[in-house]
Amino acid sequence: MGSCLSSRVLNKSSSGLDDLHLSSCKSSSSATAHKTEGEILSSTTVKSFSFNELKLATRNFRSDSVVGEGGFGCVFRGWLDETTLTPTKSSSGLVIAVKRLNPDGFQGHREWLTEINYLGQLSHPNLVKLIGYCLEDEQRLLVYEFMHKGSLENHLFANGNKDFKPLSWILRIKVALDAAKGLAFLHSDPVKVIYRDIKASNILLDSDFNAKLSDFGLARDGPMGEQSYVSTRVMGTFGYAAPEYVSTGHLNARSDVYSFGVVLLELLCGRQALDHNRPAKEQNLVDWARPYLTSRRKVLLIVDTRLNSQYKPEGAVRLASIAVQCLSFEPKSRPTMDQVVRALVQLQDSVVKPANVDPLKVKDTKKLVGLKTEDKYQRNGLNKKTVGL
C-alpha cells in the first residue's frame, strides 16, 4: 500500500481521539458519531476474516511481506482465492494489502472502525476498495485491494531511492484528476464526507496508475456548504492542513480543498509539502511557492525541473491557477471539488491536445488559461476574482 501510514496528528490528546462539536451558529448532525461498533460492523458489506486466515494469507506476517508501516502498524502483502476469498497456498490469486493495528501504536481502534464505516459502505473507482476486516481478541486488521504502484509520494520524491523515476507530466495530471474525482464523490450528496487527510502518501496508484484515496481513519460525516465543525483536537498533517482548521479548529469540505491544493503544488513543483532538509524559508511548500503564483513568468520558475520539456508552459500555468484558488486563505473563495474536477478535465484535454500558445507572449492572462469570458470562468469552476495568474 506504500508508505500511507505516516503520523498525522497536529494537536493530540492523551486519548488520541479528537472530540468534535458543532459551531454554535450552525447546526448539523454526524451519523457516524452515534453509531456503535456493532452497528458499524453489522451494516458493512465486506467480509469478516479470522486472524488465522490472514495469518495464512500473509505467510505468517513475515518480514519480507511488509510493504509499509506507520502510526497504525504494518501493512503486509497477502494472497486470497479470487472466488472464495480464502488464503491460497502459493503466491497466486488476488493480491491484497493487510493493515495490522499495533495495539500500542499511535492510531487506534476508533480509526480502524472509521475506515470500516466508510470504506465498508462507499464504492467509487477512485477510492481504495476495502475487502474485509478482522476483529479477534486484541487483533484489529483491515484487508484492501493491493495497489501495485504504491503511493503518489513514492513517484514524486526520491527519498534516497537510487532507482527513482519521477512521474511524467501526463501522469501527474491524470493522478490529480483521479484524486479530485474521489474527493468530489466524498463531498457529494448524499455521501457528504470530509476526508480530512488528503496528501501524497494517501493517494495510491494501481498497476495502470489509476489513483485512489486511501486511509479513512480521520474521515468525518459532513457538514457541507457554509456549515462547519469545530474540533477541539485538530488532527491532520502539517503542511497540508488548512490554516483556519489549524488556527481555530473549524472544519468543512473547503478544508479538504485546501489540502488538495497543496497536492497540486507538489505535482507542479516536485517538492514535498514540508521538507526540513531545505533552507528554513523553503521548508513549507505553500509559503515558498505563493510569491511565484502571482504571474505566469514566475510560475514557470518553480515547475519541477525533472520534467524537462514534457509539459507545455500554458499547462503549468493552468495547473498553478487551479492550485492557487484551492489555497485561498478565505475558505469561501475556494472552489468546490466538482469545480476542480471540471477544471482538471479541461487541463487534461489540453495536455492530450495542447494549444499552440506561448504563455510568455500572451498579454491577456485569461486567454492563456483558456478563460475568455465570465461564463467560461464559471464552467471551469474558477472564480474570476481570485485568479492570481
Swiss-Prot record:
Membrane topology of this protein: Lipid-anchor
CDD domains: STKc_IRAK
Protein name per the record: Probable serine/threonine-protein kinase PBL1
Catalytic activity: L-seryl-[protein] + ATP = O-phospho-L-seryl-[protein] + ADP + H(+); L-threonyl-[protein] + ATP = O-phospho-L-threonyl-[protein] + ADP + H(+)
Lineage, broadest ranks: Eukaryota, Viridiplantae, Streptophyta, Embryophyta, Tracheophyta
Lipidation (N-myristoyl glycine): 2
Modified residues (Phosphotyrosine): 144, 245
Gene encoding the protein: PBL1
Residues annotated to bind ATP: 67-75, 99
Pfam families (alphabetical): PK_Tyr_Ser-Thr
Modified residues (Phosphoserine): 201, 231
Localization per record: Cell membrane
A single BP term in Gene Ontology: response to molecule of bacterial origin
Free-text disruption phenotype from the record: No visible phenotype under normal growth conditions. Abrogated kinase activity. In cce5-2 and cce5-4, reduced calcium levels after elicitation with peptides representing bacteria-derived microbe- and damage-associated molecular patterns (MAMPs, flg22 and elf18, and the endogenous DAMP AtPep1), but normal response to chitin octamers. Reduced root growth inhibition response to flg22. Compromised SCOOP10- and SCOOP12-induced root growth inhibition and reactive oxygen species (ROS) production in the double mutant bik1 pbl1.
Record note on modification: Phosphorylated upon flagellin (flg22) treatment.
Protein family: Belongs to the protein kinase superfamily. Ser/Thr protein kinase family.
